[in-house]
């Protein structure tokens, strides 16, 4: 799983920057920005790793002796550490702009090691700083930038923005048989739009979204002039992939879910978002079709979905009416999924440390 990083400026962002000389070279100049420590703790808990990156003009020269810098800086680091804030690394450019070095922000020399790592989640990593050069650094790194300001984008605002859940995924799957576009919003309800060309299948997919408590949009163009096989199978593959992507690092999810009855049917569903695809399925139908959906494709749909989503899924139904039996499977799955994707904390629900 790729890692989220926050590359954070020091003066003017973590601590106040003296307007007189822009140097924190005495203990009485050291002052933390409002709310910085609790918000950094919140961000760490949400899975971000912290890296401090700062330009310190002329550090080690007569105008800014190293000893004058070290005292306040070391105290700052001790306070952060004592409160549980851990920086993976502190990156410092000591040069003046006139030196034309290759490590001064917004140049990327200091962060080249992170850029070389395939493990960095660039879509969810940020540079946070109070200057235009910090935003330029973010652009040069190919990640997001947040310009800190006490009034317009302060630490509580940043903490809220970066920890607010809005799990989303967009998957496009094109083959010779089907063209499929799936969007999933796990933290929004209502407004689902589904068009696969198979009316009863659309109704069943809507049951997953409705009872799962999330929104999805699915558009499919398939070779229905042959039959519904490729349409149903490939929709399952695309939807499973979208759900997996939307779940992200899975921190805080319940992971497990189970549900039982519907009408005269007894539908059993047990789900584990385990990362290990497996399906146990038991359902018998009187007819080959319900509406325009082939009943033999129902198992195929759930098998395809469980494979790309990476879940262990047990589904079973008994009843008298084929329509109700089919619907009970989709409703039970949706309701079970609702339990499993619900966020209750910040930790990964696995003793192995990975899902």
From Swiss-Prot:
**Keyword hit for Ribonucleoprotein:** no
Q: Which reaction does it catalyse?
A: D-erythro-1-(imidazol-4-yl)glycerol 3-phosphate = 3-(imidazol-4-yl)-2-oxopropyl phosphate + H2O; L-histidinol phosphate + H2O = L-histidinol + phosphate
Q: Where is the active site?
A: 9 (nucleophile), 11 (proton donor)
Q: Its annotated pathway?
A: Amino-acid biosynthesis; L-histidine biosynthesis; L-histidine from 5-phospho-alpha-D-ribose 1-diphosphate: step 6/9; Amino-acid biosynthesis; L-histidine biosynthesis; L-histidine from 5-phospho-alpha-D-ribose 1-diphosphate: step 8/9
Residues bound to Mg(2+): 9, 11, 130
Region described as Histidinol-phosphatase: 1-166
Q: Which cofactor does it need?
A: Mg(2+); Zn(2+)
The answer to whether keyword Metal-binding applies is yes
Q: What UniProt keywords are attached to this protein's entry?
A: Amino-acid biosynthesis, Cytoplasm, Histidine biosynthesis, Hydrolase, Lyase, Magnesium, Metal-binding, Multifunctional enzyme, Zinc
Entry-linked InterPro entries: HAD-like_sf, HAD-SF_hydro_IIIA, HAD_sf, His_synth_bifunc_HisB, HisB_N, Histidinol-phos, IGPD_sf, ImidazoleglycerolP_deHydtase
Residues annotated as binding Zn(2+) = 93, 95, 101, 103
The enzyme's E.C. designation: 3.1.3.15, 4.2.1.19
- Region: Imidazoleglycerol-phosphate dehydratase, residue numbers: 167-355
Where it sits in the cell: the answer is: Cytoplasm
Tell me a GO biological process for this protein: L-histidine biosynthetic process
The domain of life is Bacteria
Question: What family is reported?
Answer: In the N-terminal section; belongs to the histidinol-phosphatase family.
PANTHER family recorded for this chain?
A: IMIDAZOLEGLYCEROL-PHOSPHATE DEHYDRATASE, IMIDAZOLEGLYCEROL-PHOSPHATE DEHYDRATASE HIS7
- Record's protein name: Histidine biosynthesis bifunctional protein HisB
Organism placement in taxonomy: Bacteria, Pseudomonadati, Pseudomonadota, Gammaproteobacteria, Enterobacterales
